[in-house]
Amino acid sequence: MLALLVGATTGAGAIGFRWLIQGLTLVFTGTGDYAATPGAPHQWLPGLGRWFVVLTPVLAGLLYGPLVALGAPEARGHGVPEVMFAVARRGGRIPPRVAVVKSLASALCIGGGGSVGREGPIVQIGSALGSTLGRAVRVPEDRLRLLVACGAAGGIAATFNAPLAGVVFAMEIILRDFAARSFGMVVVSSVTASVVARSVLGDHAFLDLPAFRVGHLGTYALFALLGLLAGGVGVLFIRVLYGIEDLCDRVWRGPEWLRPAVGGLLLGLLLLAVPQMYGVGYPVLGESVTGRYAVGVLLFLLVAKTVATSLTIGIGGSGGVFAPSLFIGAMLGAAFGQTAVVLLPGTAGAAGSFALVGMAAVFAGAARAPITAVLIVFELTGEYSLILPLMLAVSLATGISHLLSRESIYTAKLVRRGVDLDAPAPSWAHSHRVRALLDPSCQVLALDTPLEGAADALGAAPDAELPVVDADRRLVGVLTSGAVAEWLSGEDGEELPAGIAGLVEIRATVTAEATVADALDLLERSDARGVAVVEDERVIGWFSARAVLVHIRRNDLPGTP
């Protein structure tokens, strides 16, 4: 039920986010998608000609810069790494304000000319919705992480009308796990979000293309070569993206809230020169697949998109890198296909098929998500005939990417912040204190307790061990059921003692501020079930391995021993 609700809200959120982008683009440019009419003057300000695009990123930056800096700094950038971090290191906890700030900031950035995608933001928005809902009903952490992944899957499904790709994206990139127990909830959310989006936006393929066929075996060799090139281009995109971001960090010395507006002037000049870079750029992508642009123009647009997206992120913009990687791949594939058709007319086939395969291959090279890459292009186009070329090129692109770079476009951002998701997670036991797990109401035995009374108390004790204290509640030692049972059996023929003083074991203790890991190490060394927690030599509670196991089972904690 929760997965269904997350999917429905994410689907509705994706619709609203898309409309918000279109509305703001209309305000800033006079048209719903300026990339469809690049270079046209603003219909409400015709006197400015095409120069108005220099100002739109500046105005947008003045609006979303303070919003991000003051409202939710984690809304800056492309969003997916923040969701990955929340799932892997924060138990799925994402502040509710992120959904609101990310929606407004990304819509302003894209509507104002930012050359980024809307998929990354909607993933973060959907994940924040899932996290907020899960925390509201107090689900355990394992379920909370799943609800975050449900939101991510719903975001991709609703944005692209691609429910299969949404599921795999959530499991391959967000959860980084294909466990069967996760699959059902993610599928429900993805399907629900897609149904909600289709009911409003319609059910049609993202790109309306003629059927492509691979008619010559030699064509597969060309697809393989394209995959190798795409893997290298994907890695190049990663390096340019973070290289420009580093450059902007070194150059900028002013307040962060002003950075998008000042940097927006540079972006505006770039848009003046290459208006096709305005916003997401899907119309340009579609035209490249259908063969509108010559090879030289395609390569120029590839370079321009790489720089425009990197600059948008570098100046503090908010938007995704999913769509730009598809755009770059389409330009590379279309240029490769047109060249192949000229050089090998009997082998190459349709140039458009290379553009589609290039989209998937560059995304795979950048994101290291080969299954998502294959499915996303398949669902975007509805073109099953290219499944084998897609699988071949994507596999090679992923392999080349691994050879050239350790990190993907998503994990690189986290590694630069000192977070390595591939490294073992910091142990929960090393970061939590005994105070959180001690039993302050544990029974203690007085030193003069009769043996029979001690036996009864130990019989009711969960760990069959109890601390023994003197009249000032200072710890004397620990009495175990084994020691008492030995005396009560009377096998050695000795007279039963009147009290327990002679049966008490002297043991090490822990303080409430000791780490859980240290306390567990002590239990392991002493082969004991529990240990007394003391403060100024007085017993304040009892810590046991049993309490740790109960806590882990209830919370399904990551990184536990």
Which residues does each PLM region occupy?
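Alpha-helical transmembrane segments and immediately membrane-proximal extracytoplasmic
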Residues: 1-431, 435-441, 445-476, 530, ...
